[in-house]
């Protein structure tokens, strides 16, 4: 891959970055499409829902820096910053598209620098998602990636080789997330309607979430809360489900997985199956729910309806423990509206430390909301757009301090924007 960069300027030059592996190929077909949604009609207003009135701002919070194009020419579906690195360490992120996972550094002075590119041995693989962790013994950065083939690859970034391969899901994997504190725990959501919890240190599947009252269609998005004791999931069945891990059974299974040895044990690991979520609702969205993340005790979720919804289970005054599993009621806190994004598998970026959300649309534009913790409905919204950014924006990621915003597109481009120095987030 070349290291050509596009620098700041009013008339940016186009630049392509290649992986240097011409043997890897990509075939577009309907089975790997991430675009079609069941309805292209605009979202209808529903009773009790409050629209967020964004406060006007004089200029965009972020300024264009550079963009590159990966030479596979295919959709890039996923992007993730390594937020585990220290404040003084380089800002590193990875992209997932075609059968490749590409790692870049964002130098402080601007631009993008290629660090590594991993090409899956299966040329038919299409990666949809990636997530960062590190080896608990060596502290080497690890990158998990998965997609169309339903196989999770855990890659040692420095060695540029897979050190773990996890097979269990029957179909494609749509999202991966690592536990915020126990970084050997990896969560995966799949087209097979199930969520799995893995231990990448002992290479076992700890739990399967799904079944009797689980998702009825593809699981599209998953997330741990900041404490790591709850999971939220969403899917094609229009539902959002919450799963608690703070039970004696889960504590025991997680501890057991840390010491379990497949070589020494004559029996397989006793994977637990949780058929019943601790909360479930279909009252928030009327279409595929393709992105969900925790915001403290609130949940941010979106569908193909031109709005990100901030909500919580039960009534506003209720704690999660007071909400019964049989109660599907929920409270809408705020909505963040945008335009021209009515296809599925378009995922927003959220920086919980700096309270900023960003989402792209089908026209290559990006909406950025700077949240006011004292007034969730009074978010500042600005729009980012470069004349050369015209393809669907699939996912957005922020650096830990939110100084850099990166997004990836259907035309194989990767875009970097820098926070303006005068902007306070």
Curated annotation (Swiss-Prot):
Keywords: Chromatin regulator, Developmental protein, Nucleus, Phosphoprotein, Repeat, Repressor, Transcription, Transcription regulation, WD repeat. InterPro entries: PcG_WD-repeat (IPR051243), WD40/YVTN_repeat-like_dom_sf (IPR015943), WD40_repeat_CS (IPR019775), WD40_repeat_dom_sf (IPR036322), WD40_rpt (IPR001680). Its main location: nucleus. Residues 1-10 have a biased composition (Basic and acidic residues). WD repeats lie at residues 71-114, 126-165, 168-208, 214-253, 284-321, 340-379, 388-424. The modification Phosphoserine is found at residue 15. Residues 11-20 have a biased composition (Acidic residues). This is Polycomb protein esc. It comes from Drosophila melanogaster. The gene is esc.
């Amino acid at each position: 891959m070349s290291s050509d960069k596009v620098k700041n300027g009013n008339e940016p030059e186009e630049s392509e970055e290649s992986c240097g592996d011409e043997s890897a190929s990509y075939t577009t077909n309907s089975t790997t499409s991430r675009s079609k949604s069941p309805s292209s009609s605009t979202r209808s207003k529903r009773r009790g829902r409050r629209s967020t009135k964004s406060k006007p701002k004089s200029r965009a919070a972020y300024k264009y820096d550079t963009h590159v194009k990966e030479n596979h020419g295919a959709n890039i579906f996923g992007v993730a910053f390594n937020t585990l690195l220290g404040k003084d360490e380089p800002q590193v992120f990875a992209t997932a598209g075609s059968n490749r996972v590409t790692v870049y550094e964002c130098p402080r002075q601007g631009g993008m620098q290629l660090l590594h590119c991993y090409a899956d041995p299966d040329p038919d693989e299409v990666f949809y998602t990636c997530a960062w962790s590190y080896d608990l013994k060596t502290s080497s950065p690890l990158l998990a990636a998965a997609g169309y083939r339903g196989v999770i690859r855990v890659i040692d970034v420095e060695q540029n080789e897979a050190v773990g391969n996890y097979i269990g899901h029957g179909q494609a994997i749509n999202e991966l997330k690592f536990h915020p504190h126990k970084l050997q725990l990896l969560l995966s959501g799949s087209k097979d309607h199930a969520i799995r919890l893995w231990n990448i240190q002992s290479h076992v599947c700890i739990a399967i979430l799904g079944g009797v009252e689980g998702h009825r269609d593809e699981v599209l998005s998953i997330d741990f809360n900041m404490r790591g004791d709850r999971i939220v999931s969403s899917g094609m069945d229009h539902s959002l489900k919450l799963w608690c891990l703070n039970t004696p059974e889960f504590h025991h299974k997680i501890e057991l997985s840390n010491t379990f040895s497949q070589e020494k044990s004559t029996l397989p690991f006793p994977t637990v199956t949780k058929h019943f979520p601790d909360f479930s609702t279909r009252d928030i969205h009327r279409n595929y729910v393709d992105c969900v993340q925790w915001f403290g005790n609130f949940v941010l979720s979106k569908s193909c309806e031109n709005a990100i919804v901030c909500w919580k289970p039960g009534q506003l005054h209720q704690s999660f423990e007071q909400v019964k599993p049989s109660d599907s009621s929920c409270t809408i806190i705020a909505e963040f509206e945008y335009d021209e994004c009515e296809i599925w598998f378009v995922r927003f970026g959220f920086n919980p430390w700096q309270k900023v959300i960003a989402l792209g649309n089908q026209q290559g534009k990006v909406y950025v909301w700077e949240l006011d913790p004292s007034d969730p409905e009074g978010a500042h919204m600005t729009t980012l757009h470069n004349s050369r950014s015209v393809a669907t924006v699939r996912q957005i990621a922020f650096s830990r301090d939110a100084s850099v915003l990166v997004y990836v597109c259907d035309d194989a481009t990767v875009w970097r924007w820098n926070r303006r120095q005068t902007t306070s987030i």
